[in-house]
Amino acid sequence: MKPTYCGYAAIIGRPNVGKSTLLNQLLEQKISITSRKPQTTRYQILGVKTFKDIQVIYVDTPGLHAGTERTINRYMNRTARGALRDVDAIVFVIEPHWESQDAWVLDNLKEIETPVFLVINKVDKIKNRAELLPLIEKVSSLYAFQKITPLSAKTGDQVGTLEQAVHQLMPESPFYFPPEQVTDRSDQFMASEIIREKLMRLLGQEIPYSLAVTLIEFRKEEKIIRISAVIWVEKKSQKGIVIGKGGERLKRVGTNARLDMEKWFGKRVFLQLWVKVKSGWADNERLLRELGFEE
């Protein structure tokens, strides 16, 4: 029997460098929510890509960040660091410039013996690729990376080059997931994340970090899926902002989320949304566990 190869590759980096966009591009479909706001990803998400005799399980993680003032931030940091355990490869994503937070992430990686690929993302924003040479020289002096790949997760340029390099590090092993499976997350999780993405995209800078979404109903029928969800905020004033004048903003969130869900599930979706206040949830460990955050 022809051997198969299977392993894990963790995607790591500071917030808002395009880790989730890269995962979606590698999988050729969207499983991880994205927005222009940092720390959009809160949970560890597995994305499974099977190509002939090779299966790579990519681990999308929350952005590692030095600021740990809030309990939710500490939870996300622990999630990101936990993803580095027992993986076969690490994909460290940066933008076309080196920041102090990148150095902080790299310090976390230096304690690990796993091979690290450095990805310089968002090169579609650079007119002359020669501008990257000083950065490549700098990062090469900081760490012995397995490979340095400038690419664009947005356009897909050079993503295949990274993928081929990751394939070479996958150990001989049976597949861990059926070839047709693309994520370990449930339909209910995907529905709640789609709602949160639409909120992140429509709201201002501060409110999204005080938001959480939980489902109170998820019922599949023959021709339709019925979903009811609660959007949790920390303050009464935030509730009004989420709902909007005459309920207009909440209606837009619902419409946008429903359309995405219908693409994901392949059938009609009936979606109901409510907004409720749960004061201090982002700093309360018990409430964080209730909302799906893990140690």
Swiss-Prot record:
Its main location: cytoplasm. Residues 121-124 are annotated as: G4. Pfam families: KH_2 (PF07650), MMR_HSR1 (PF01926). Residues 13-20 are annotated as: G1. Residues 203-279 form the KH type-2 domain. Residues 60-63 are annotated as: G3. Residues 151-153 are annotated as: G5. Residues 39-43 are annotated as: G2. It is found in: Cytoplasm; Cell inner membrane. Residues 5-172 form the Era-type G domain. Keywords: Cell inner membrane, Cell membrane, Cytoplasm, GTP-binding, Membrane, Nucleotide-binding, Ribosome biogenesis, RNA-binding, rRNA-binding. InterPro entries: G_ERA_dom (IPR030388), GTP-bd (IPR006073), GTPase_Era-like (IPR005662), KH_dom-like_a/b (IPR015946), KH_dom_type_2 (IPR004044), KH_sf_prok-type (IPR009019), P-loop_NTPase (IPR027417), Small_GTP-bd (IPR005225). GO terms for biological process: ribosomal small subunit assembly. It comes from the Bacteria. One of its GO terms (cellular component) is cytosol. GO terms for molecular function: GTP binding; GTPase activity; ribosomal small subunit binding; rRNA binding; small ribosomal subunit rRNA binding. GTP binds at residues 13-20, 60-64, 121-124. It is a peripheral membrane protein. Monomer. PANTHER family: GTPASE ERA, GTPASE ERA, MITOCHONDRIAL. NCBIfam families: era, PRK00089.1, small_GTP. An essential GTPase that binds both GDP and GTP, with rapid nucleotide exchange. Plays a role in 16S rRNA processing and 30S ribosomal subunit biogenesis and possibly also in cell cycle regulation and energy metabolism. Belongs to the TRAFAC class TrmE-Era-EngA-EngB-Septin-like GTPase superfamily. Era GTPase family. This is GTPase Era. The gene is era.
